Amino acid sequence: MTVEERSNTAKVDILGVDFDNTTMLQMVENIKTFFANQSTNNLFIVTANPEIVNYATTHQAYLELINQASYIVADGTGVVKASHRLKQPLAHRIPGIELMDECLKIAHVNHQKVFLLGATNEVVEAAQYALQQRYPNISFAHHHGYIDLEDETVVKRIKLFKPDYIFVGMGFPKQEEWIMTHENQFESTVMMGVGGSLEVFAGAKKRAPYIFRKLNIEWIYRALMDWKRIGRLKSIPIFMYKIAKAKRKIKKAK
């Protein structure tokens, strides 16, 4: 099948990425409605943070790819703040890991199937075990994320499983590229890139304490806990510069 067409929710353009101006509650209802309608298409959800937006501004193919998603939601306070600076305020930040957990709650109630694709074999196994304890009504299957985009062996395995959800934790851009490369081989499936969420569910990484999340500085905690992320922090000032430049351009156009 194919990806559900872009939703009819209001859109907010952040440096060319078309975000849906929605809330977590609305997204949960959208996912429930998708299954209730028994669509044979797939629901492709992108959770984009400033780093993803930055990457998209310099990689046209990736920008075009994610703009084909059914929904693009703001996973990052930086995106929400940018929308306010551009006078197109997004309603809420929707963290990818929390949206994934909401999907799992729906899957648990409906006795659905979930495929976890990503991370190392050890980590994804641990994530599946932990999630199975939390959501016993879900049928899980998994595979590690160290595969080529064109690897059809894994795709065949997933097709045989017939999942209702495929959560891809390979990091961007690979996870979104994998989804769009293979989505036409599935039907009636929610597909979402979830970055490092599998590591968090596995217990390999800790999510930021509540106070960091409340203050919208979860990214600082992640950088402090994982030195490999330090180099990625440079994307924040670059993103801020691009937003400031876009704001000046809007002012000049008036």
From Swiss-Prot:
Annotated keywords: Cell wall biogenesis/degradation, Glycosyltransferase, Teichoic acid biosynthesis, Transferase
Domain of life: Bacteria
GO molecular function, one term: N-acetylglucosaminyldiphosphoundecaprenol N-acetyl-beta-D-mannosaminyltransferase activity
UniProt pathway: Cell wall biogenesis; poly(ribitol phosphate) teichoic acid biosynthesis
Record's catalysed reaction(s): UDP-N-acetyl-alpha-D-mannosamine + N-acetyl-alpha-D-glucosaminyl-di-trans,octa-cis-undecaprenyl diphosphate = N-acetyl-beta-D-mannosaminyl-(1->4)-N-acetyl-alpha-D-glucosaminyl di-trans,octa-cis-undecaprenyl diphosphate + UDP + H(+)
Keyword Transferase: yes
GO BP annotations, alphabetical order: cell wall organization; teichoic acid biosynthetic process
Enzyme class: transferase
Enzyme Commission number(s) from the entry: 2.4.1.187
Function: Catalyzes the conversion of GlcNAc-PP-undecaprenol into ManNAc-GlcNAc-PP-undecaprenol, the first committed lipid intermediate in the de novo synthesis of teichoic acid.
Family according to the record: Belongs to the glycosyltransferase 26 family. TagA/TarA subfamily.
Name of the featured protein: N-acetylglucosaminyldiphosphoundecaprenol N-acetyl-beta-D-mannosaminyltransferase
Organism this protein belongs to: Staphylococcus aureus (strain MW2)
Lineage: Bacteria, Bacillati, Bacillota, Bacilli, Bacillales
